[in-house]
Amino acid sequence: MAIVDWPAHERPREKLLAHGPAALSDAELLAIFLRVGVPGKSAVDLARELLAHFGSLARLCHASQQEFSSINGMGPAKYAQLHALLEVARRALKEDFTQGQTFESAQSVKDFLRLTLGHRPHEVFACFFLDVRHRLIAWEELFRGTLTEARVYPREIAKRALHHNAAAVILAHNHPTGNTEPSESDVILTRELCRALAMLDVIVLDHMIVGRNHVYGFLEHGKM
């Protein structure tokens, strides 16, 4: 049965307008994006098929064009629309991190990091540089590596902290494997950076490890 023939309160678009997007399932939200299904399948049926095929909404969003287009009814146009939508979300979150903003919500930082680093196929080490009142001065991606590691140079981080006249930093890097548990080398590096930056009177507030669906914070786990 086509969605247009469903009772109005069950149609995804009408349901969203009546109750807000949080009331919809992943499949219903995806169906609104898809707009139409394929012969024999409604947009909701197609959305469920996509989610079942990829395993989750996050994996669907991070699928390659070839993987995405392997599903009947999906192609370059839908792939482009999806990634345009994701980029809009990234940029909207990034606007929340304007110069001079005070960091008050750990969750907003995590959301930004997931959208910015969670999908990267290689490790990226980045840093928020903050002033004495913990307002944002700059966000920089400093080092890029392989699937399993990024070579990090404490001296370069110290140079950037001095360049920005930062009083504090939040460190972040991603684990492309999706496992956000810190490795022994992550713990050792964090200690080294804390010591090195302390000599410059720069405080390391946190170190966050970013996966596709989760962000691990050293601070909240008592490792700072």
From Swiss-Prot:
Binding-site positions, Zn(2+): H173, H175, D186
Keywords for the protein's UniProt record, in alphabetical order: Hydrolase, Metal-binding, Metalloprotease, Protease, Zinc
Span(s) of short sequence motif JAMM motif: 173-186
Stretches assigned to the MPN domain: 102-224
SUPFAM superfamilies: RuvA domain 2-like
Highest rank taxon of the organism: Bacteria
A matching Pfam family: RadC
Classification via InterPro entries: MPN (IPR037518), RadC_JAB (IPR025657), RuvA_2-like (IPR010994), UPF0758 (IPR001405), UPF0758_N (IPR046778)
MF-aspect GO terms: metal ion binding; metallopeptidase activity
Any one biological process term the GO annotation gives: proteolysis
Family: Belongs to the UPF0758 family.
NCBIfam families to which the protein is assigned, alphabetical: PRK00024.1 (NF000642), radc (TIGR00608)
Protein name: UPF0758 protein Rpic_2712
Organism: Ralstonia pickettii (strain 12J)
Lineage: Bacteria, Pseudomonadati, Pseudomonadota, Betaproteobacteria, Burkholderiales
